[in-house]
Regions:
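Autoprocessing Asn-cyclization modules and mimics
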Residues: 4-94, 100
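All-beta strand scaffolds that present successive hydrophobic residues in beta-strands
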Residues: 1-2, 119-121, 147-151, 170-174, ...
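Short loop/beta submotifs within extracellular cysteine-rich repeat domains
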Residues: 67-68, 99-102, 232, 258-259
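Extracellular beta-strand-rich, repetitive "passenger/adhesive" scaffolds
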Residues: 26-38, 123, 152, 205, ...
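Cys-His-centered catalytic/binding microenvironment captured across papain-like cysteine peptidases
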Residues: 73-77, 90-142, 195, 269, ...
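Short glycine/acidic-rich loop motifs that flank beta-strands on beta-rich extracellular proteins
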Residues: 129-137, 157-163, 180-191, 200, ...
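Right-handed parallel beta-helix
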Residues: 57-86, 121-221
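Short aromatic-glycine motifs in intrinsically disordered, low-complexity regions
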Residues: 66-74, 106-111, 381, 403-404, ...
Length: 538
């Protein structure tokens, strides 16, 4: 299909497609405030009078915007089927609600006669002009149920090749888009966009030089499988969600830049239970109000033509990051809705010098398990929340600065740290626990494998089962500033020095340690607040 000299479209109208399918919106509308909370994952909704509804009817249902939030910030906007009249004031719908709705929020129901089972297949489409008026695109669906698209291969379309809004149960498969006229105009240059959609599958699609391959906006229970976007250097990211309270989405086996829930506060920058598996890209950002994000086998490879940092960023709100690889990794926090921990396990990161690993706003606990960090030079863990590193391997760059840690509670349990170290920022009261056979080796620019800055915070040190080996110019532990409570039992120090300034120690217990060729540069005398006997000095 070619569309030269096609009739001009109207302003901002992505539904002005060559093939446009639109259901009928009736005049039947009901609005009512909720008398009680509508819980998450329910399919039973209160209504003023269930007699107004019939089983098998289709209705749009939406909640009023969040009070004090963005203009379009709504947790619920879906096209749903009435599946049962429960009682005089409740109906059951074909959708399990993704977000709790508080009492007092207003729901609006509108009856719709949707387009049903209209399919478009096997089309080669060439777009027309370069703007919203002269451009063209193949197909749009609005208020549609069970309408599938397959085998559309488009070039140069302005609006999305497949545009959907208020759609339920659909497939978009084996479609492609190359070289739209713009990737800078919002809403244009997409292969497919879904707004207020349910139960969709996008599969086996490809794009080149587009804004988005797939955009899911205020949608739920959808999958995106085996889709691949290249030419994503010039302003487009193939995979995105709008951040309008999307939930329960799966991305599996795709490639291309990914940016989740990041269209702006107007829509809420929120999403929940998004899972990304076996994904390859050079930039992956998910640092807005994304709750219970799951990443498995995501590989981010730095590319000189786009993000040379190879960035992967997540929100510390129930994120589970497993088996992932990136150059730059950062944990942010914009929300605190989850009940599950934020855990990063079996991952590999090659951190840039001075990079912030845990950002300032992070107050949630963050747990790194069996992770490998290379090229570390002054990486910063700035947030106040607890940080735990279990069996991690951290390798510093040449003449590297130690990790700078602001966490109020840092636990290092096992693992190996080579040519790096820990310096507590002491911007607040802090506790550091080193246990589980941690091995520290090498040296760093600060001249201390474990130390603290001269901040105002009180630091509590608990070192047990540590093995530390270094040269004569480097301290295993250096405590020279502030107020400190120090405990070291059952540790092995080889070479190096111990620098424990008495005036900086409110209490000290250093016992049952092996000091093999280690010089005590400073050490408190035994007394009521200090005990240093019972060590093996070799």
């Amino acid at each position: 299909i070619r569309t030269e000299n096609i009739e001009k479209n109207t302003h901002d109208n992505p539904f002005g497609a060559v093939l446009s399918f639109r259901g009928t919106v009736t005049d039947t509308t009901l609005s009512h405030p909720l008398a009680a909370t509508v819980i998450e994952l329910t399919d039973t909704f209160p209504v003023p009078d269930a007699k107004a509804f019939g089983v098998g009817q289709w209705w749009t249902v939406q909640v009023a915007p969040v009070e004090g939030g963005g203009r379009d910030e709504r947790e619920l906007q879906k096209l749903v089927e009435i599946t049962e009249i429960v009682d005089a004031t409740h109906v059951r719908i074909g959708y399990l609600n993704g977000w709790e709705l508080a009492a007092g929020r207003t729901l609006t129901w509108t009856r719709v006669e949707p387009v049903r089972n209209s399919h478009v297949r096997n089309m080669v489409f060439e777009g027309a002009g370069p703007d919203e008026y002269t451009g063209s695109h193949p197909v749009s669906f609005e208020y549609a149920v069970g309408c599938d698209v397959s085998g559309i291969h488009a070039t140069g379309t302005f609006w999305p090749v497949v545009m959907r809004r208020w759609c339920t149960r659909f497939r978009t498969e084996d479609c492609s888009l190359k070289n739209p006229p713009t990737v800078e105009y919002g809403g244009a240059g997409y292969l497919t966009q879904q707004i207020y959609c349910l139960y969709g599958r996008v599969a086996d699609c490809t794009t080149s030089n587009v804004r988005h391959l797939n955009d899911l906006t205020a949608s739920a229970y959808c999958t995106v499988v085996n889709c691949h976007g290249d030419g994503d250097d010039a302003g487009g990211n193939p995979f995105t969600t709008h951040g309008q309270y999307e939930h329960d989405l799966l991305f599996d086996g795709n490639s291309g830049l990914m940016d989740i829930a990041n269209s702006g506060a107007q829509w809420g920058i929120s999403a929940k239970r998004l899972t990304v598996r076996r994904h390859v890209c050079s930039w992956f950002v998910a640092n807005t109000k994304i709750t219970d994000l799951t990443l498995e086998d995501v590989t981010v490879i730095a590319r000189p033509t786009f993000d040379q940092a190879g960035t992967l960023t997540v929100n510390a709100d129930g994120a589970q990051v497993r088996g992932c690889t990136a150059k730059t990794f950062a944990v942010a926090q914009r929300s605190a809705r989850s009940t599950r921990p934020t855990t990063v396990s079996d991952c590999s990161f090659d951190l840039p010098a001075g990079g912030v690993l845990v950002q300032t706003p992070v107050t949630a606990p963050v747990h790194f398990v069996r992770c490998t960090f290379t090229g570390v030079d002054g990486a910063v863990l700035r947030g106040a929340g607890p940080v735990r590193l279990t069996d991690c391997t951290v390798t510093g760059a040449e003449d590297a600065a130690p990790l700078s840690v602001g966490s109020a509670d840092l636990t290092i349990d096992g693992g190996r740290y080579e040519n790096t170290g820990i310096e507590l920022s002491a911007v607040r009261d802090q506790r550091i626990t080193v246990t589980g056979g941690v091995r520290l080796t090498g040296r760093n620019r600060a001249g201390a494998l474990l130390g603290r800055a001269a901040g105002p915070g009180k630091v509590t040190w608990d070192l047990t089962g540590l093995s530390s080996t270094t040269d004569t110019a480097t301290a295993h532990v250096r405590i020279a500033d502030g107020t400190n409570h120090y405990l070291a039992t059952g540790n092995r120090f080889t070479g190096g020095t111990l620098h424990l300034v008495p005036g900086a120690l409110a209490s000290a217990l250093h016992t049952a340690c092996v000091e093999d060729g280690t010089k005590r540069v400073a050490m408190p005398d035994d007394g009521t607040t200090a005990r240093t006997e019972g060590n093996l000095i070799l």
